[in-house]
């Protein structure tokens, strides 16, 4: 995905306000051996790009002053109550170095699972993304989570995800294998089932 930006000459709070009034958003590119680079982007184009999941999870081709570099979106600052992007951070990517980032989770086939079909359970998505490590060339746009075999009362964990080649989960001390989805039967459904099984007097 290509992103066009321009070198930012003006700095400071007043300059940022003037840029916003002109329909621009400030940003910075950092990482690698090059010095951090201050940039500005067209606000409307950026606003629409940020609505796309791939913009947050893919390697982006950022063009500044005719020079292209591969980057990852690392941070976005929004206005507290206006539909306004205040600032964005991009990190340069080295094709030979592994990167840590978060991949979105796409949940599939819950409607055909035993939990839903046999037990009328509700499948909850406990996590919407997960931290991974891989080379830039191996970075997946998203990870699929197959829920077709989940049963009532069961949970799926991070290590249940089928990872593409070259992609590894980043383990954390406090949650090495976190729950990403669970299937629970609503209390009302359990009560109704119990009443249906009560033998007649």
Swiss-Prot record:
GO terms for molecular function: 5S rRNA binding; structural constituent of ribosome. Coiled coil: none annotated. InterPro entries: Rbsml_bL25/Gln-tRNA_synth_N, Ribosomal_bL25/Gln-tRNA_synth, Ribosomal_bL25_b-dom, Ribosomal_bL25_C, Ribosomal_bL25_long, Ribosomal_L25_dom, Ribosomal_uL5_bac-type. The keyword Ribonucleoprotein applies. Pfam families: Ribosomal_L25p, Ribosomal_TL5_C. It comes from the Bacteria. One of its GO terms (cellular component) is cytosolic large ribosomal subunit. The keyword RNA-binding applies. Keywords: Ribonucleoprotein, Ribosomal protein, RNA-binding, rRNA-binding. One of its GO terms (biological process) is translation. HAMAP family: Ribosomal_bL25_CTC (MF_01334). This is one of the proteins that binds to the 5S RNA in the ribosome where it forms part of the central protuberance. Belongs to the bacterial ribosomal protein bL25 family. CTC subfamily. Part of the 50S ribosomal subunit; part of the 5S rRNA/L5/L18/L25 subcomplex. Contacts the 5S rRNA. Binds to the 5S rRNA independently of L5 and L18. This is Large ribosomal subunit protein bL25. It comes from Burkholderia cenocepacia (strain HI2424).
